[in-house]
Amino acid sequence: MKSVSSVVLATLLAVNANANPFEGFDIVDLTHAFDANTIYWPTEKDFKHTESFAGETEGGWYYSAFSVQTAEHGGTHLDAPVHFAQGRWSADQIPTAKLFSAAVVIDVKAKTANNPDYRLSVEDIRAWELQHGQIPKGATVLMNTGFSMRWPNRLEYLGTAERGPEAVRSLHFPGFSKASAEFLAHERDITAVGLDTASIDYGQSTDFIVHRLLYERNILGFENIANLDALPPVGAWLIALPMKIADGSGAPLRIVGLVPAAR
């Protein structure tokens, strides 16, 4: 069976050279902008955007340039498998075809509204499949917790506004369960998982078992995604393009959804 990434690439290549290959799709930005309010793990430093020059030059034209400083894991970003699995793909080693996939969106907002420690269950996945069919080969499974609506309020989004190693024990946000990770890793042939919280493991995790299970199999992770409500449960495509950092355990990510336009 062909993977969904090969199917979508073949479809785009088959389009008339003079036609817009994205005609018929609404393009949804699923990325939080990087700025002074960007949320990082409590042990990481904030994003810095430092002006080198901005203004009129001696020649009379406008010119601006800035430098940036960022941790790999903050804002909307990629977790490369090597983040928790030695010898697996780093950010620059991920095959390009893995960055194009079908989107499977599992909405659990009703369950996370009063339970910030909720974890996606196998039952949630099976309920989605009962309605929409089996998760297609090569898909990205997205968990829509509704937490992106809390961005960039650190207290509401992370469960704590504290910083430093001692703050980690106070984190409260949803993630995938160990059982759901095992099911996706062994029973379904997926490319990636993603969600609109700071980690694919829930905030109170101390063993990061979801990271370890998935990344050992070179399954990618996308964290701090925005606007998942704009995607349907099935039928959309993802383009997820991380910064190509050599040996990177992760990278800032620009991720967009292609949603079939209503006719």
Enumerate the language-model features and the residues they cover:
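Active-/binding-site microenvironments in catalytic and ligand-binding cores
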Residues: 19-263
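Bacterial N-terminal signal peptides
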Residues: 6-16
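Positively charged n-region of N-terminal signal peptides that target proteins for export
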Residues: 1-4
